[in-house]
């Protein structure tokens, strides 16, 4: 490990995240070469996630690269497990319903949670829980257009206390393309996980598919989990996992977190919940730089819903007079998409 020495900020027995005192400095450390924010993670918490034997065959893991639809999928799965009844999602914070595997407050430290457990992770496949690969537990991996990911992550970095200041849009874009952001390279992350696609306990789905056909996507997820729903329950899942419903739900919109963790004065956690917002932020030069790296990194990899001729070209129109306009300049409420 190199970089600043992480400090444990709480004991593993503390569970009420919304009432904790957080002291973040925006510093990162590296674990097996990948950057992680100090305070939220530690070498010990990452090693626990990687090496624990606490995996059950009916566990459900929701895995994403940051800002790719994690919370949306958590909401959907929670509703599916309750046959569309929204009582659970309205009474327990989302981070307790689907705790993180790799944080210092680790899901694996809570041994008495009833089955089936939902757990969340941003870990790349090479650091993921080894015991999963010899189990019948299931992973739902959500992918998203990396152009939208970088915009959402830029805004999130402005309000999240544990993350480095993103700097200028150009600086942040370059860091993203080099993998010098939390959890490392988006390209390596998705290429690693999609190798699992032929496994029956792995489902790959995209943010764009959820947006284009939420009902059909929920049916796919139900089939994967072996939990078919009737029409009424299915409609309830769709209605209560919609962006507007999540944004209005205090148990799902992260408004309960302290300002030291999320500075709500600077913006909302659930910002827009749309696809294609990158076109409102990238200059032509930034889009061309992104596309060049994308083509190089993803050569020979399967095509995704965002791999269209439209997405592979620069946004319409001419760049703004400023060579690198701040994305925050056109949004009065900067925050982070789901």
From Swiss-Prot:
Record's keyword annotation contains rRNA processing: no
This enzyme's EC code(s): 2.8.2.2
Record bears the keyword Cell membrane: no
UniProt: substrate binding residues: 95, 100
Molecular function as annotated in GO: cholesterol sulfotransferase activity; sulfotransferase activity
Family as reported in the entry's similarity comment: Belongs to the sulfotransferase 1 family.
Biological processes, Gene Ontology terms: cholesterol metabolic process; sulfate assimilation
Signal sequence, start to end: none
Bias (Low complexity): 327-338
Organism: Mus musculus
Its biological purpose: Sulfotransferase that utilizes 3'-phospho-5'-adenylyl sulfate (PAPS) as sulfonate donor to catalyze the sulfate conjugation. Preferentially sulfonates cholesterol. Catalyzes sulfation of the 3beta-hydroxyl groups of steroids, such as, pregnenolone and dehydroepiandrosterone (DHEA). Cholesterol sulfation is approximately 10-fold higher than for pregnenolone and 20-fold higher than for DHEA. Plays a role in epidermal cholesterol metabolism and in the regulation of epidermal proliferation and differentiation.
Residues binding 3'-phosphoadenylyl sulfate: 67-72, 144, 152, 207, 241-246, 271-273
The name this protein goes by in its record: Sulfotransferase 2B1
């Amino acid at each position: 490990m190199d970089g600043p020495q992480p400090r444990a900020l709480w004991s593993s027995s503390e569970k009420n995240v919304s009432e904790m005192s957080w002291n973040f400095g925006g510093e990162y450390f590296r674990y097996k070469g990948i950057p992680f924010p100090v305070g939220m993670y530690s070498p010990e918490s990452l090693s626990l996630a990687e090496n624990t034997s606490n995996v059950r065959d009916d566990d459900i893991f929701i895995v994403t690269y940051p800002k790719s639809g994690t919370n949306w999928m958590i909401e959907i799965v929670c509703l599916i497990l309750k046959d569309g009844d929204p009582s659970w999602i309205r009474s327990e914070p989302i981070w307790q319903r689907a705790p993180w595997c790799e944080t210092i407050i680790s899901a694996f430290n809570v041994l008495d949670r009833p089955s089936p457990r939902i757990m969340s992770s941003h870990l790349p496949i090479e650091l993921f829980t080894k015991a999963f690969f010899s189990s019948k537990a299931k992973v739902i991996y959500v992918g998203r257009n990396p152009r939208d990911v970088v915009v959402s992550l830029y805004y999130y970095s402005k309000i999240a206390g544990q993350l480095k200041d993103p700097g200028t849009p150009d600086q942040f874009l370059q860091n993203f393309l080099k993998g010098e952001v939390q959890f490392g390279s988006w390209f390596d992350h998705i290429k690693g996980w999609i190798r699992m696609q032929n496994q029956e306990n792995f489902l790959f789905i995209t943010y764009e598919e959820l947006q284009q056909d939420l009902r059909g996507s929920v049916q796919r997820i139900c089939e994967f989990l072996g939990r078919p729903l009737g029409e009424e329950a299915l409609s309830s899942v769709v209605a209560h996992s919609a962006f507007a419903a999540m944004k209005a739900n205090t148990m799902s919109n992260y408004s309960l977190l302290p300002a030291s963790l999320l500075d709500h004065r600077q913006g909302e956690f659930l910002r827009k919940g749309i696809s294609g917002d990158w076109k409102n932020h990238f200059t032509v030069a930034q889009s061309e730089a992104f596309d060049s790296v994308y083509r190089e990194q993803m050569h020979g990899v399967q095509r995704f819903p965002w791999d269209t001729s439209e997405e592979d070209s620069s946004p319409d129109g001419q760049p703004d007079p400023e060579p690198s306009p701040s994305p925050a300049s056109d949004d009065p409420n900067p925050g982070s998409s789901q």
